[in-house]
């Protein structure tokens, strides 16, 4: 769920998801359109695509199990939905961590109306 995703982000980046990733670029936060602004925004684009594939799941509310040790997040046992949601969230948190060096504060609270490029397909 979103609280677990927030915790994963904190583990991998040392940043709070709110405000650092809730409205970053064109894809971090609710919805998304246009072309991702940078590598961090692309992490959100890929995460959105991952959630889109989970048609019979509730990724924002379903609770899953995971563990963290020495900077490695591992998804635990659960239903197929729980495992898939966890993997989507884990991959995004890892992606955020890998792209911290290029994180740009100017893309925080980026206005949607500036996301005018044609959208990419998942």
UniProtKB/Swiss-Prot annotation:
Tell me where it mainly resides: secreted
Q: Which reaction does it catalyse?
A: a 1,2-diacyl-sn-glycero-3-phosphocholine + H2O = a 1-acyl-sn-glycero-3-phosphocholine + a fatty acid + H(+)
Q: What is its EC number?
A: 3.1.1.4
* Pfam families assigned: Phospholip_A2_1
- The domain of life is Eukaryota
Q: Which GO terms describe its cellular component?
A: extracellular region
Compartment(s): Secreted
- Which residues does the entry assign to the active site, renumbered to this chain? 47, 89
What does the entry state regarding organ or tissue expression? Expressed by the venom gland.
Name any cofactors this protein relies on: Ca(2+)
Record GO biological process: arachidonate secretion; lipid catabolic process; negative regulation of T cell proliferation; phospholipid metabolic process
Cofactor binding comment, as recorded: Binds 1 Ca(2+) ion.
Top-rank EC class of the record's enzyme:
hydrolase
- Disulfide cross-links: 26-115, 28-44, 43-95, 49-122, 50-88, 57-81, 75-86
Q: Which residues bind Ca(2+)?
A: 27, 29, 31, 48
GO MF term (any one)? calcium-dependent phospholipase A2 activity
- Keyword Disulfide bond belongs to the record: yes
Q: What does this protein do?
A: Snake venom phospholipase A2 (PLA2) that shows myotoxic activities. PLA2 catalyzes the calcium-dependent hydrolysis of the 2-acyl groups in 3-sn-phosphoglycerides.
Q: Which family does it belong to?
A: Belongs to the phospholipase A2 family. Group II subfamily. D49 sub-subfamily.
- Provide the protein name: Basic phospholipase A2 Sms-N6
């Amino acid at each position: 769920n979103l609280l677990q995703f927030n915790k994963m982000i904190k583990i991998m980046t040392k940043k709070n998801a709110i405000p650092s990733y809730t409205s970053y670029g064109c894809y971090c936060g609710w919805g998304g359109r246009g072309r991702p602004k940078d590598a961090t925004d692309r992490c959100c684009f890929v995460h959105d695509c991952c959630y889109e594939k989970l048609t019979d799941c509730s990724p924002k509310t379903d609770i899953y199990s995971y563990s963290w040790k020495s900077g490695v997040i591992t998804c635990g046992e659960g239903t197929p939905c729980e495992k898939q949601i966890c993997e989507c969230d884990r991959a995004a948190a890892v992606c955020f961590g890998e792209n911290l060096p290029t994180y740009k504060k100017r893309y925080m609270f980026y206005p949607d109306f500036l996301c005018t490029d044609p959208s990419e397909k998942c």
